[in-house]
Regions:
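Alpha-helical scaffold domains
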Residues: 1-210
Length: 210
C-alpha cells in the first residue's frame, strides 16, 4: 500500500482537487490524480483481493478507486456487497464501483436488486449502471423498484439519476424485440415531467427499433 500511495502522490494535481471542491465533490483526502492514471498504476498490483480490501477502507480517493481495479470481480460475493457499497458517497465513486467492479461480477443482478431499493440515492444510481451491464435482465422484473427509485431523487442528482435509468432501460430494450417494447411501455408509465423527458431523450432513440 505504501508503494502505491507514493506513486499516486507523485501524480498529485492540486488544480484538479480545487476544481472538484468547486463542483461539490468532497473526499476526506484527494490528490487529484486522474482516473486513467489511477487505473494504470493499480493494474501493477492486480489481482490482489486482500490489498484491494485494505485500500478501500482508507479515506483516500485514489486508494479507494485503485482498489476497484485491484480487486478480482470473480471473487466478489453477495455477502461482500455492503462492504463495496459503503464508500459510494460521490457520483464518481458510484460510477466506478458499478462499472469497474460490481458490474463485472457474478452477483451483479443481486447488487442491482438490493442497491436499487437502498436509501442512498447514489447507490441507487450505481445500481442502475450495474443493471446496464447485466445479461438477460427483464425490465418487467425491476419496473416497480425502478419506478420507486425515480420517485425519490434528491436535488442535484436529477441528471445523473436519469442517465442511470436511461442506461438501464436502454440496455434492457436492446436485448430483444419483446424487451424493447416493454422498455418503451415502461417509460410511458412514468409521471410526466423533467425526469421522464430526460430519460426519453437519452434512451428513447435506442428503443425506436431493435
Amino acid at each position: 500500500m505504501v508503494a502505491l500511495l507514493g506513486e499516486l502522490r507523485r501524480e498529485m494535481n492540486g488544480a484538479v482537487v480545487d476544481s472538484m471542491r468547486e463542483k461539490g465533490i468532497e473526499y476526506a483526502l484527494s490528490y487529484g490524480v486522474s482516473i486513467p492514471t489511477i487505473r494504470a498504476l493499480a493494474r501493477q498490483y492486480a489481482p490482489d483481493d486482500e490489498l484491494a480490501r485494505l485500500l478501500y477502507q482508507q479515506q483516500v480517493r485514489e486508494l479507494q478507486l485503485a482498489a476497484l481495479s485491484i480487486a478480482s470481480p470473480e471473487s466478489v460475493t453477495e455477502e461482500e456487497l455492503p462492504f463495496w457499497a459503503k464508500a459510494v458517497t460521490t457520483v464518481e465513486m458510484a460510477e466506478n464501483v458499478a462499472t469497474v467492479l460490481i458490474g463485472r461480477t457474478a452477483v451483479a443482478k443481486v447488487a442491482l436488486r438490493k442497491w436499487l431499493a437502498d436509501d442512498n440515492a447514489l447507490l441507487r444510481y450505481a445500481a442502475m449502471l450495474v443493471g446496464g451491464r447485466c445479461n438477460e435482465l427483464d425490465i418487467n422484473d425491476i419496473a416497480e423498484s425502478l419506478t420507486k427509485a425515480l420517485s425519490d431523487v434528491p436535488v442535484g442528482l436529477e441528471v445523473v439519476t436519469t442517465h442511470g435509468a436511461a442506461v438501464l432501460i436502454g440496455a434492457c430494450g436492446a436485448r430483444s424485440e419483446e424487451q424493447r417494447l416493454a422498455a418503451r411501455a415502461f417509460i410511458d408509465t412514468l409521471p410526466e415531467g423533467s425526469l421522464r423527458e430526460r430519460i426519453e431523450d437519452e434512451a428513447g432513440w435506442q428503443l425506436e427499433q431493435y
